[in-house]
Amino acid sequence: MPKSSVNASLSSYDDIFSTEESRQEEQREQVRQIPIGELFPFKNHPFKVLDDDSMSDTVESVKQYGVLSPLIARPRPKGGYEIISGHRRQHAAELAGLETLPVIVREMSDDAAVILMVDSNLQREHILPSERAFAYKMKLDAIKNQGARSDLTSPQVASKFRSDDEVAKGQGISGDTVRRFIRLTNLIPELLDMVDNLSLIHI
């Protein structure tokens, strides 16, 4: 395979490459090799990690080239590290038989970790409505928590408006769209699955 074709193929793996901001930050931080057994998924991680064709391609890429972009994780109080960015890379590496992974370890608050986790995963090409719904809700709650701590005198309605807009920022959507997605989290699982299945028809 021509070298250019390999590069083009690798560039399509959104779970291997992170955002430009994250890459710049990684250059300023030390990458550590962490045993896979010490890495744990993010609590209530809203994005599915599926053993589909895309994962199979990622596993083959990891076997050939390794994990090209480090994971981001934070220390857990009980030991080990909680993955913030890189759940698919971790799963692919496990299937590929790797024993350690390159990881950037950061000390982060719960809210800051939620925001980074959501933002890094929203770079993926195909995201189910249910994933967006719970991700937006988690980010909205985290932003509200941060706002409540920094400005306890702000009116609740105004704070909600700003928070919705903050979640929408960078996604090319409006605060109203964010609210519509978040309302999906109130659906029973059967109805939420129907919404996801309908979206897959149009992918």
Question: What is each stretch, according to the model?
Answer:
Residues 1-106, 112-126:
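Short, charged/polar connector segments at secondary-structure boundaries
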Residues 190-191:
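Long, charged low-complexity interaction segments
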